[in-house]
Amino acid sequence: MALSKTAQPMQSSLRKIAVVVATAVSGMSAYAHAAETPKKEETITVTAAPAPQESAWGPAATIAARQSATGTKTDTSIEKVPQSISVVTAEEMALHQPRSVKEALSYTPGVAVGTRGASNTYDYLIIRGFAADGQSQNNYLDGMKMQGNFYNDAVIDPYMIERAEVMRGPTSVLYGKSSPGGLLNMVSKRPLTEPLKEVQFKVGTDSLFQTGFDFSDALDDDGVYSYRLTGLARSNNAQQERAEEQRYTIAPSFSWRPSDKTNFTFLSYFQNEPETGYYGWLPKEGTVDPLPNGDRLPTDFNEGAKNNTYSRNQKMVGYSFDHEFNDTFTVRQNLRFAENKTSQNSVYGYGVCSDAANSGNALCNALSPADKGHYLARKYVVDDEKLQNFTVDTQLQSKFATGDVDHILLTGVDYMRMRNDINAWFGYDASVPLLDLYNPVYSDFDFDSKNPANSGPYQLLNKQQQTGLYVQDQAQWNKVLVTLGGRYDWAEQDSFNRVTGTTASRDDNQFTWRGGVNYLFDNGVTPYFSYSESFEPSSQSDAQGKPFAPSKGKQYEVGVKYVPGDRPIVLTGALYQLTKTNNLMADPAGSFFSVEGGEIRARGVEIEAKAALSASVNVVGSYTYTDVEYTTDTNYKGNTPAQVPEHMASLWGDYTFYDGALSGLTLGTGGRFSSSSYGDPANSFKVGSYAVMDALVR
């Protein structure tokens, strides 16, 4: 059994102290007042104030969130969404102490988070057996896509968000172009009208040093104006030697609430990462399989050059606005402008010299057959990118009734524009020395000679646009809830090659829809059935230079949810079949180009439990079964896609003491299991199963 190399933090939180003191003062004040004027036969009636209504865009009181907007774009109870939704609250993240959002999803069903090992450079996810097309993430912040391109993807620190939500299955009916497996949506921390004062310090293994703060309060007596200021600074070594992670983040926000019907919130996010950590490729020789001499590589092995660097800078500004005209009509608008810059100088592994992919490497061909099995071929990349992204989503929500049927009708239009300026050079030549895995010798690489500012074969200006019109009706008659929605998208992409002076363009128009039925029993049990669709444009072209048509996803899902009204418990189970058509595959004629027509089918079962059993006890558990297969493909028909484990399971529990000498102490432990998965689509080798144990003392 392997232990994770996640640091075990020591944390000090001023927020907990403030809560305890405030409670004690409040209690003494009430007691003193009652003692002032004792009366005979006095009857005192105590009425508990109702708990504040949870909002899909705000904090949840426990680890078991009951509301979400990710699945409907409206503030909807989880049991009323006809698809699988998982919510990881800030409370749960505080228990697990993740260093990335993908780590925060480690106990979430249907999501494979460890496809790049311990690397936290990106939050790449495989959901229900599918990853996003190309290198881009399928991640959203406050309901708007953080559109990435090439190596330029934004990453949000988990300390800066209130929720991380995963919607599994096709989502194009609400969000447009998307991976068929699902998406991740993060909800930013927002201003509060009650005082919040938190300062934290962490130290841990891998030379972890972190400090963070989270302040919020109203700026006036009426709570019309409020602010929130959240920040973090962290430095730690990555698991691989000679790799470091540094992050400095601050997120100021401001809210204006002139009435209980109007809310305007300014949101911003600024993050600088001088070093994003390790992002390379380890060979199967020495990791999955032993080297020819029987040895294995150390767990901190790094195949890169001594002077590898990978930095990123992010800036985001925007707002969230909503206004309730009356009991029927509410308008909402979310808007954001983002700018991301990445700079990378990296040497990375490309398999041992005996691999067929390295048959054209002159350095490999100079070796004897016996040596090819322990010499690692390497490539380099020199890359500078500047990406700008603008997104706006405007919605009109209408609540009304037609006879005995209550409706929540949502109509909306959203627009996204992305521009990424790429200057890159990559490949391998005699200047990239081989690495002897028996006795690796590291040196600096002359990246300046490959500087793309001077010249480079990969100088592109990539542009993407998407406009979508959508409508959705949540119609409830007694205990039957029908959700029906449709969307039409206009998607454009252009790639201008500065080297050749040519432009490749592709326009796609696509209609997608979703239908679902839920039956709401009085005891909190809700069975449901749904059908949903997705589409995902391709950036590749055929042998004649014609861009490929989008791939499409179709899913049938049946499940049951248990969300009792009087207890913080969420239990869900789902059974689904998901098919991706028009997947790209190798040309049967043997050319180096791909062709359309491939198909991948996924079937699976997912079970999740989240429960705050008492004020002291939390339990989180999940199980995932995923059966994915290339049903139509030139080379891989019948095979399983890479990096998709058949089984995953997790269980977590924690206990907080509220009395005695241990009052305020929280103890927790958990475990995660993943079965083996194939390392390539040819299914030529497997990466073994593993189990990881987690522990908490706070």
PLM features: what roles do these ranges have?
Residues V317-E339, R378-F496:
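Face-selective signature of the C-terminal outer-membrane beta-barrel domain
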Residues D322-E324, T330-R336, N340-Y348, P527, ...:
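Membrane-embedded beta-barrel scaffold of Gram-negative outer-membrane proteins
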